[in-house]
Amino acid sequence: MEFEKALSILKNLCSENVVEHCLAVSEYAYELALAIKNKGYEVDVELVRLGGLLHDIGRSRTHGIEHGVVGAEILRELGFDEKLALIAERHIGAGITKEEAIELGLPPKDYLPITLEEKIVAHADNLIFGTKRVEIDDVIKKFEKRLGKNHPSIKRIILLNDEINNLLK
């Protein structure tokens, strides 16, 4: 599916601020994917670009924690590739464990990013507040304020940040 068609669908479903955020995440994720590919790693840069664009399509129906799961459902309903649906489903923070999903009222399974493409989009999303790129310290502060200093998702965010940065060395 080409970028412009996906962007048109996103614009039809989501508010302007969500679209602008998705464009910023897509651009940053694409830059990261190209840089990682240039280091010799196997990465589907177009999947990352589209995944970044569509990761928050679930916000057309909800802004709750379930927007990743809802987004994956929307993408499947619209006939998008399963790889894109999984990017949406697994992009929140650095993922959600099955145990956390149960506590949050999500369908009971792991929502942790597995593929490199999923990880790049989740990481890029973490580092974009609205349309602005921020540092990892800002991300950690935001999640600590929201979830508490010792929440396991914060450690996962730091590990994901380290993993992506190591690929760029």
UniProtKB/Swiss-Prot annotation:
A Pfam family that the UniProt record links to this protein: HD
Taxonomy, superkingdom: Archaea
Domain HD as annotated: residue spans: 18-130
Stored InterPro entries: HD-related, HD/PDEase_dom, HD_domain, HDIG_dom
Protein known as: Uncharacterized protein MJ0778
Organism of this sequence: Methanocaldococcus jannaschii (strain ATCC 43067 / DSM 2661 / JAL-1 / JCM 10045 / NBRC 100440) (Methanococcus jannaschii)
